[in-house]
Amino acid sequence: MSVDLVNNPPHYSAFGFESLELLEKVFNLMPLKNMIFYIGNALKYSIRSKFKGNEIQDLKKCEFYIKRCSKLISEDFKIFESKEIMCYLTKISEKDFKLFLLINDIIHFALNPSQRNYNAVVNHIKKYIRERI
């Protein structure tokens, strides 16, 4: 049986769900739609980081895209939570708790794009990368 690297690459379903499902749930709740591209890429690179073959490079790409959000931050949004998103995060936490914490911070920032949350996620990414070098 061959692996379909176009329609179902294994590094995007390594946590037991297709990562696009999580991204779509997050995008639907994001108050700043102009951050979707950056957040989507940050989540993509963080989710696949342990499974694609170059973890540090993927984590640095994640950091790059989060930093692109800095000019789009606003302080005028309410906190969002989603039971659907928590189901995906639970699956990630069961396999890799530290990566879950990072992805959770990225999603928290995506749904609540404040300077405080931006600073927290940037610091978390840097720390996560340092732990892996």
Spell out what each predicted region is.
Residues 1-133:
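Intrinsically disordered, low-complexity regulatory regions
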